[in-house]
A protein has these predicted regions:
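N-terminal Rossmann-like NAD(P)+-binding subdomain of aldehyde/semialdehyde dehydrogenases
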Residues: 1-108
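ALDH superfamily catalytic-core signature
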Residues: 7-9, 200-258
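Residue-level signal for inorganic ion chemistry
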Residues: 35, 80, 141, 172, ...
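Conserved small-residue-rich beta-alpha loop and adjacent elements
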Residues: 98-170, 213
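Short beta->alpha connector loops at strand-helix junctions that form conserved
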Residues: 142, 147-149, 176, 196-197, ...
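Active-site phosphate-binding strand-loop segment of PLP-dependent enzymes
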Residues: 168-206
């Protein structure tokens, strides 16, 4: 697979983001039937290329097809199904109380998308943690720049192919590459940044986002104690602790630490 477009500088990335922002400002992503169509098309593509996706996970991480489906692809399908079932309700205006000083007016909250969002995903769940936040952003009506991890090269190549074959490039772009690509992305003003990874990189992203007061969601892992009550079934508890620690070779943010 050869990408249709290459990015050699921050200026190239900026030009791409500018095109996406112009597309967003046309209002093309606002109709719910448009968003629904995107999710249905993505699901159909994944179903058709399921073996390819699972093989990429095997190539990168040694995951069996069962584990790849259970911990990644199946979760992506669940997210698509959930968003399809809830998106119309989420989009409805929500009536809220109005202060007496504003009588006789009424108040509502209208949900609106941010604009162009950046999703920076990690290598340990390279499919799930790239597609799930992207699906959520698209459901809300955003455009998305996806930056997958350079460590999971096979999955990143699959994601780039998926993005080019499923989406209008003004809606979604996949920008794989080195840490230099991360620097280029962080030098640009996005309307939302979603990052999963280490606290060290998370601090850099928060610092860069502060320059533009960009809204940020950081999932940085942490410590995960496992508490076993005195009246627990010890055998069953031990099995579950071992499963939680060993699944994905222990590379899970909530794997039991102690």
């Amino acid at each position: 697979f050869l990408p249709s477009r290459e990015y050699h500088s921050a200026e190239d990335v900026q030009a791409a983001v500018d095109e996406m922002r112009e597309f967003f400002q046309t209002g093309a992503t606002m109709p719910l039937h448009y968003r629904r169509g995107i999710l249905v098309k993505l699901r159909s593509y994944l179903k058709k290329h399921e073996k390819e996706a699972l093989q990429a996970l095997t190539d990168d991480l040694g995951k069996s097809s069962f584990e790849g489906y259970a911990t990644e692809l199946g979760i992506v399908y669940d997210e698509i199904r959930f968003c399809l079932s809830k998106m119309y309700g989420w989009a409805k205006p929500k009536r809220v109380p109005t202060p007496l000083a504003h009588f006789p007016s009424s108040s509502k909250i209208y949900a609106s998308p941010y604009g162009v969002a950046a999703v920076l995903s990690p290598w340990n769940y390279p499919l799930q943690l790239a597609l799930v936040p992207m699906i959520d952003a698209l459901t809300a009506g955003n455009c998305v720049v996806l930056k997958p991890s350079r460590t999971s090269q096979s999955t990143s190549a699959f994601l780039q192919k998926l993005c080019e074959e499923v989406f209008d490039e003004r809606l979604v772009r996949c920008l794989p590459g080195s840490s230099e690509m991360n620097d280029w992305i962080l030098s640009i003003h996005f309307d939302k940044i979603f990052f999963t990874g280490s606290p060290t990189i998370g601090r850099q992203i928060m610092h860069a986002a502060a320059e533009n007061l960009t809204d940020v969601t950081l999932e940085l892992g942490g410590k995960s104690p496992c508490i076993i009550a005195s009246d627990a079934n010890i055998k069953r508890a031990a099995q579950r602790v071992a499963w939680g620690k060993c699944i994905n070779s222990g590379q899970t943010c909530v794997a039991p630490d102690y």
